[in-house]
UniProtKB/Swiss-Prot annotation:
It comes from Scolopendra mutilans (Chinese red-headed centipede). Contains 2 disulfide bonds. Expressed by the venom gland. It is found in: Secreted. Residues 1-25 form the signal peptide. This is Putative neurotoxin 2. It comes from the Eukaryota. One of its GO terms (cellular component) is extracellular region. Residues 26-46 form a propeptide. Keywords: Disulfide bond, Neurotoxin, Secreted, Signal, Toxin. Its main location: secreted. Belongs to the scolopendra neurotoxin 3 family. GO terms for molecular function: toxin activity.
Length: 77
């Protein structure tokens, strides 16, 4: 029974980590588009999110060969 609780706890923690990363990647994409095209997704090519301590690093790339990095800061509630 204890092993089941441990496995369940680990699964919940991993699920939380994945959901935080997905949310951060979505925030990254929105921030890239907002900063470069004022919300227009037509020239958007790709975004990569790398988690860091107290935030993350976004790599933004557009079809017109514009590439840049953004540092996101996560606010702690």
């Amino acid at each position: 029974m204890k092993a089941f609780i441990v496995i369940l706890s680990i699964a919940i923690v991993l699920l939380l980590i994945v959901s935080i990363k997905e949310t951060s990647a979505k925030d990254c994409k929105q921030e890239c588009v907002k900063r470069y095209t004022n919300g227009d997704f037509t020239n958007f090519f790709k975004v990569e999110y790398g988690p860091e301590r107290r935030g993350g690093k976004c790599y933004c790339e557009f079809t017109c060969r514009v590439k840049f990095y953004i540092h996101l800061k996560h606010e702690m509630n």
